[in-house]
Each structure stands twice: as C-alpha cells, then as structure tokens.
Amino acid sequence: RALKRVREELGFSNVIVMVPFCRTPAEADRVLEAMAENGLRRGENGLQIYMMCEIPSNVILAEQFATRFDGFSIGSNDLTQLVLGVDRDSGILANLFDERDEAVTRMISEAIRNAHAAGIKIGICGQGPSNHPDFAAFLVSEGIDSMSLNPDSFVRTIKAVAEAEGQSG
C-alpha cells in the first residue's frame, strides 16, 4: 500500500520494486498475487518488479523467474554465503568468504547469462565490486548491466570498470 501511494499519490512512478529472498517460482507467484491484491501489477503504469538473485535456486531456475520479473539484482553477499556455506560475520568462517571464489563466480556468470538469454537486465549489489576492483572487472567481462558501489570505492572501481570495458571493446 505504501508503494502504491508513493507511485500514484506522490508521483514517483519510476520506483522499481525489488523482491528479496524469493526461493521458488511458486513463492514468486504468491508475492505477485499479494501485490496485485493491493493494486500493484507488473506492467501497469510502468511498474517494474525485480528480484534479488541471491539464492542458488534463483540462478538454477532463472529462466522461470525471468518470466515473472522484469530484472534481477545479484545479492553477492548472500549468494556467496549460500554457495560456500559460510557466514561472513563468523569469526571462524569469515576468512572463507570471498565473492571471487570459483564456485561463486561460476554462479554469477550463469546468472548473467541466464538473465540476458531471457532478455532481462541484471545488476549486482553487495560489497564485492567495491572491495575488489578485479571482481568489478570480471563482472564487466561477463556483461553485467549495473553495479552498486560504496561511495569511498567509486573512483577506484570506475577506473577498473573503464579499463575492463576498454579491453572488451
């Protein structure tokens, strides 16, 4: 209801809904039904609905999720934790948390490929691109559409992105 008010009464029709931690396509359907019951329907008045791609099932079933959502945003922190089975806040396991781990980068590559194959945009939010310019360059080489960055890493990461884009032509 609040989102409907923001879009319709306050005039912020460019607000995009981002659905977090959506485990299954059936759960996505229930979320979209609940939104529709409250007057928010995908495509009406330009409403776009994105899904956080932060669970391995989101990547594996991306084709099915893409029929329900307008885009994805990779939640690299949660995806890394769930792919590697680690808790980045644990004193015992935090040293194993790394978005650049091969299992994680393969999962991210697959997510990007699957989203683009379905004709939808995919971005990334999380610490990875801000903390590791080489990770940002990897994302560019894979064709990511957008990245969120921490303000203190913006200039450094933009330089890495520009260099990677120059190399990819």
Which residues fall in each region the model found?
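Conserved alpha/beta-domain cores
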Residues: 1-169
